[in-house]
A protein has these predicted regions:
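Alpha-helix capping/termination and helix-coil
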Residues: 370, 602, 655, 659, ...
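Membrane-water interface at loop-to-transmembrane-helix junctions
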Residues: 731-750, 770-774
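Generic alpha-helical transmembrane segments
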Residues: 707, 752, 774-788
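Helix-coil boundary and interhelical linker segments in multi-pass alpha-helical membrane proteins
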Residues: 687-696, 760-772
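Conserved cytosolic headpiece of P-type ATPases
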Residues: 1-726, 736-737, 750, 777, ...
Length: 870
């Protein structure tokens, strides 16, 4: 069956079983039984308890739970308590973030206007929007939110702002004409859509779709069917957890086999293996990563980027494609006059001279033949008309004053058939009719032209020159209005017959201009290896003109329309997207397909936008970025990040922050794993050598959860560097555990383990196993605290300013050193931590071994740096 916009008014009324008189209450009830309420439905929500328990599905967390169970069976209550506390805190943090993430459909409901004027039982009544049904006749006027989708049956110069649905900033002129061809949403001029606004005129429409069947409802369905994406960090950490668990099993198996082979009891050998497992798993890793990302969100919030989904902090730093909406994102979402063409000259608005009679006439007439107002900063009316009022205001002209000086005495409102608007005024003692409209249409009716030398007959050469200028404006993406006038007789009532014998005055060209910061932000993206792509519901020429201004597009061949990709297969689209930088006249479904096509090519995609039409693609993208000021609630709630200043440049800063945070998280992971590897190495060496276990399980948990956690968090707050923006985006499939990264962890862990083992042997030979264990415990704690400074850079930093540029790391070191020194020297701690009291000389020996590990690792970095320079 044909779409409603391709059917006549009578065919539509028959199809929805209605008439121009509307429905009766009985008919409305019957229709509601078939179609339901005019509201958006939701999928089943997860309870907070479900969300909370989902946090325990993390692979590392499951390993920790298993370790806690084994420790409990073996009677190690302290280990169980510490592990349970850590994973519970992590689950609470994850739940708080997730609970905020699924509110898109609630925001979409807000677009169903609270009330509407409807014809019911033969009279006009005001009803809640949710009670409207298919077949109802709704009455529309300027300022109304349209409550449902409908086919127009009456039209009086109706204009509708559909930017939230289509992305096009200009109000759409509506008509009653039946369309024969299949056209995009933005070109269905005989239809009105739920969630859009009437900006001008009046009309009547018969409702054709309500609730989930409206265009807004279809978007709600897309939101429900679009799955959440994992960020690269989530993928990498999951991969890391699996690899780590394999290593742990291998190490534990080796240790258990060695112990049994040496004749130890299976129970004690198993306990020994559990101690190694506890040492191998960085218990605080999940919570530390979450805390570092949380600190990152606070920093980004201060820089106008609100993070709604925690892992988006890192994910944004790895994007390689930014698919950006045009209207309100790259542009100001505000029509602005760019140029005048008057007396044969093109004049940029920056060069306007109101002492010039022609320019002053054109400005005055653009105010008089204009229905918009701007009082106390509140704009009412069509965006193109408010642009004319705003320009006058910028030049010190008050529209109200000019209108009072030359009051309107008659008018012929704009309609899409005539493509013009006329007003009558008393000017200089004469009745003057001002006519504005489409250039081609007005030139047909023009007989004279205003020049500085006076009014003369317009020639064919004049018309060609005007048409060429109009074409030039259009190719630059500018919307053009022509202004003409004529004298009419006294006490004259305007009619369409008067719209001829006109005198041409000039052209005014306007556009929704780019934001001032967009060009620089796009250039910064390209420098960082990120490709910006414009996706918009606007016209191709307009979109391409904006894209060329800001550096997204170089040639018109890089632009296409939604119709061009409509019939492409997914495989064809995947090959097509690298060639295109601008997509115009696209639907929400097109946006999702474009995002998916880039994702299938292995790209990490960010999608920016502010309208309802952007919401599904925002959710499909790896990172959805919504505008906070001009953005709809739907877009904000579907996004992972919201920009509070609507500044495209904020995205670039967010990318920089994301890259730096990922780097800092790598520092923290490097710190934790190399330290843990040192502990494993010490345990294995002792086992192979037939020596006592150098650590008690409580030692290892103390190190992992106290002296490790604070430095790791501090490394996550390492000062940011702008140098990361000189690098290309990180590959989506690149693991965080590269060979080079693992090599550094292994080498640094070896040094820490070696110093720990030497310290253990020193204490062991001094006074037996307990003192040896105390030496090993103290050295490992302090060596890992010193190691925080090693992890700040791949280069040696010990004799540079960078060694001291992180006050958080310095604080963590001092606090950790005080804690471990207290444990080693205060007798009350000895029974709990299973250590022996150290005297000053013994304590100095422990510190010396720990500091030696710092010096050795710094020396190895210096050697590596010099080797690479060669």
């Amino acid at each position: 069956m044909k779409e409603f916009y391709r059917q006549t008014v009578k065919e539509v009324l028959d199809r929805v079983e209605s008439s121009e008189a509307g429905l009766t209450s009985e008919q409305a009830d019957h229709s509601r039984e078939k179609c339901g309420w005019n509201e958006l439905t939701e999928g089943k929500k997860k309870s907070i308890s479900q969300i909370f328990f989902e946090q325990y599905k993390d692979f590392l967390v499951l390993i920790l739970i298993a370790s806690a169970l084994i420790s409990g069976i073996l009677g190690d209550v302290e280990s169980v308590a510490v592990i349970v506390i850590v994973i519970t805190i992590n689950a609470i943090l994850g739940t708080i973030q997730t609970v905020k993430a699924e509110q898109s459909l609630q925001s979409l409901k807000k677009l169903s206007g609270p009330e509407a004027k409807v014809l019911r039982d033969g009279t006009t009544v005001q009803l809640p929007a949710r009670e409207l049904v298919v077949g109802d006749i709704i009455l529309l006027e300027a300022g109304d939110m349209i409550p449902a989708d409908g086919r127009l049956i009456e039209n009086a110069s109706l204009k509708v702002d559909e930017s939230a649905l289509t992305g096009e900033s200009l109000a759409v002129e509506k008509d009653l004409e039946t369309l024969s061809a299949e056209v995009p949403l933005g070109d269905r001029t005989n239809m009105v859509f739920s969630g859009s606004f009437v900006t001008y005129g009046r009309g009547k429409a018969v409702i054709t779709d309500t609730g989930m069947q409206t265009e807004v409802g279809k978007i709600a369905g897309l939101l429900k069917s679009t799955s959440e994406k994992q960020t690269p960090l989530q993928v990498n950490l999951e991969e890391f957890g699996k690899k780590l668990s394999i290593l742990i099993l291998i190490f534990c198996g080796i240790l258990f086999a060695i112990s049994v082979f040496r004749g130890e009891k299976i129970g004690s050998a198993f306990m020994f293996a559990v101690a190694l497992a506890v040492a191998a798993i960085p218990e605080a890793l999940s919570s530390i990563v979450t805390i570092v990302l949380s600190f990152g969100t606070q920093k980004m919030a201060r820089e106008h980027a609100i993070i709604r989904k925690l892992q988006a902090v890192e994910g944004l730093g790895s994007v390689s494609i930014i698919c950006s909406d045009k209207t309100g994102t790259l542009t100001q979402n505000k029509m602005t006059v760019e140029d005048y063409y008057v007396a044969g000259k093109r004049i940029p608005v920056s060069e306007l001279d109101l002492d010039d009679p022609a320019q002053r006439f054109l400005m005055d007439y653009s105010i008089l033949c204009n229905d918009s107002t701007n009082e106390n900063g509140v704009e009412i009316g069509d965006p193109t008309e408010t642009a004319l009022i705003n320009l006058a205001s910028q030049h010190g002209l008050a529209a109200a004053s000019i209108r009072n000086l030359y009051p309107r005495e008659g008018e012929l409102p704009f309609d899409s058939d005539r493509k013009m608007m006329s007003t009558l005024h008393r000017i200089d003692g004469k009745n003057r009719m001002i006519v504005k409209g489409a250039v081609d249409r007005l030139l047909e009716l023009t007989e004279q032209i205003w020049t500085h030398d006076g009014i003369r007959e317009i020639t064919e050469a004049d018309k060609i020159k005007i048409q060429q200028q109009n074409q030039s404006f259009s190719m630059e993406g500018l919307r053009v209005l022509a202004f003409t006038y004529r004298e009419v007789s006294e006490k004259h009532t305007l009619s369409m017959d008067d719209e001829n014998h006109l005198i041409f005055l000039g052209l005014i060209a306007m556009m929704d201009p780019p934001r001032e910061e967009s060009k620089a932000a796009v250039a910064e993206c390209i420098k960082a290896g990120i490709r910006p792509v414009m996706i918009t519901g606007d016209h191709k020429i307009t979109a391409a003109a904006i894209a060329k201004r800001i550096g997204i597009l170089q040639d018109l061949s890089e632009a296409c329309e939604g119709a061009d990709i409509e019939n492409m297969s997914d495989a064809e689209l995947k090959d097509f997207v690298p060639k295109i930088s601008v997509y115009a006249r696209v639907s929400p479904e097109h946006k999702i397909r474009i995002v998916r096509a880039w994702q299938e090519k292995g790209m990490i995609v960010a999608m920016t936008g502010d309208g309802v039409n952007d919401a599904p693609a925002l959710k499909q993208a790896d990172i959805g970025v919504a505008m906070g000021i001009t953005g709809t609630e739907v877009a904000k709630d579907a996004a992972a990040m919201v920009l509070t200043d609507d500044n495209f440049a904020t995205i670039v800063k967010a990318v920089e922050n994301g890259r730096n945070l990922y780097q800092n998280i790598k520092y923290a992971i490097r710190f934790l794993l190399s330290g843990n590897f040192g502990a494993i190495l010490a345990v294995l060496c002792a086992s192979i050598a037939g020596l006592p276990v150098p650590f008690a399980p409580v030692h290892l948990l103390f190190i992992n959860l106290l002296t490790d956690s604070l430095p790791a968090i501090a490394l996550g707050m390492e000062p940011h560097s702008s140098e990361v923006m000189n690098e290309k985006p990180r590959s989506a499939d690149k693991s965080i555990l590269t060979k080079d990264f693992l090599g550094k962890i292994g080498l640094e862990g070896f040094v820490i383990g070696a110093m720990t083992m030497l310290s253990f042997l020193t204490g062991y030979h001094m006074n037996g196993a307990l003192l040896g264990s105390t030496f090993a415990f103290g050295t490992l704690c302090l060596a890992r605290l010193f190691h925080g400074f090693n992890c700040k850079s791949d280069h040696p930093v010990i004799f540079t300013k960078r060694f001291f540029n992180n006050k958080w790391l310095q604080g963590a070191f001092v606090l950790g050193a005080v804690l471990i020194t207290s444990v080693l020297t205060v007798p009350e701690f000895h029974r709990v931590f299973k250590v022996e009291t150290l005297n000053l000389m013994q304590l100095g020996c422990v510190y010396l071994y720990a500091f030696a590990s710092l010096l050795i690792i710094q020396l190895l970095k210096w050697i590596r740096m010099k080797f690479r320079q060669r």
